[in-house]
């Protein structure tokens, strides 16, 4: 099992210095940790919303195909909407085994017009927007804690990712298919790091794996299971935090494969909040470090330019979802 420390959300909200130090250590070492929502008033409300979102996720990703097709993503123009099964490839050039539906934070918050949604989702907007706001609060709390522990002004990271400004931040609903057959026991979502700042992941069934520090993604023994825990979010750092801190905070490689044990016989539903910087935020490093490896050329880019560059790199490698084939 992956070594993921558990951080108390209640103590973090109270700005406990030792808890904040624990967050920094986790983000430097593994880049992943569990955020325990239990025993806290706000955390309890979050748990209730997550339970509702799991039902919404299942309902949405089991809509008829003709409904999904009306709201399918339009790659490369837009990644919003449904990503169908098999649209991306794994490391063995096999089709992926997951579907997802991406909703823009900008649309949900009113920064931009709301994207077209399946009719069933409009009635769920209040709980989705409430959850979105709670996630924004968590991100802000983590950003302040990390800035403080890095001896930066507490507003350093929050100033670069205001929820009221345009960004690539999304609320994502995912379905990973059950694996009843031997040929299903493979990679579902290829190894990758997240583009953004911080990801908040809610799931019940296993399948997420984290690469050990120093391990090769081609070495199966270097992959460790990230076990979900009741009442906890899985939190991980994204590439933007690594870029801003000159490599001090770690954006760790991870992947999704078939669930372990008997869990592989059921479909897995996941709710993810993927925070990204404001589109116009600078990707210039905020800390002077000795790491001058390969990212100096990115310092003059805006966050949007930087994300497009990374997305195109993934697309050239064949790992990103591909554009629809034109119909004959």
Segments and roles (model prediction):
Residues 1-328:
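Peripheral, non-catalytic segments flanking oxidoreductase cores
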């Amino acid at each position: 099992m992956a070594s993921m420390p558990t951080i108390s959300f209640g103590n973090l909200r109270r700005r406990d210095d030792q808890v904040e130090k624990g967050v920094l250590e986790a983000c430097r070492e593994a880049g992943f940790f569990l955020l325990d929502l239990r025993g806290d008033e706000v955390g309890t409300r979050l748990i209730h919303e997550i339970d509702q979102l799991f039902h919404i996720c299942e309902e949405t990703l089991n809509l008829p195909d003709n409904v999904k097709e009306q709201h399918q993503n339009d790659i490369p123009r837009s990644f919003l909407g449904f990503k169908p099964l098999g649209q991306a490839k794994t490391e063995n050039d096999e089709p992926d085994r997951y579907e997802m539906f991406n909703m823009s934070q900008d649309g949900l918050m009113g920064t931009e017009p709301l994207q077209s949604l399946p009719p069933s989702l409009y009635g769920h907007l209040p709980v989705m927007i409430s959850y979105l706001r709670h996630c924004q609060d968590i991100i802000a709390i983590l950003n302040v804690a990390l800035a403080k522990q890095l001896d930066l002004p507490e507003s350093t990271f929050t100033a670069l990712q205001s929820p009221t400004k345009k960004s690539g931040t999304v609320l994502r609903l995912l379905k990973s298919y059950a694996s009843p057959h031997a040929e299903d026991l493979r990679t579902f979502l290829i190894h990758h790091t997240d583009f953004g700042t911080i990801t908040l992941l809610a799931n019940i069934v296993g399948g997420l794996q984290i690469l050990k520090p120093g391990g090769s993604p081609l070495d199966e023994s270097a992959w460790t299971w990230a076990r979900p825990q009741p009442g906890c979010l899985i939190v991980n750092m994204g590439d933007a935090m690594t870029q801003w801190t000159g490599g001090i905070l770690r954006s760790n490689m991870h992947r999704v494969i078939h669930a372990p044990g008997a869990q592989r016989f059921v479909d897995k539903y996941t709710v993810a909040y993927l925070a990204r910087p404001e589109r116009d935020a600078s990707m210039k490093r905020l800390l002077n470090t000795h790491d001058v490896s390969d990212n100096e050329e990115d310092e003059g880019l805006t966050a949007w330019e930087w994300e497009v560059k990374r997305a195109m790199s993934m697309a050239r490698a064949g790992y990103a979802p591909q554009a629809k084939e034109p119909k004959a």
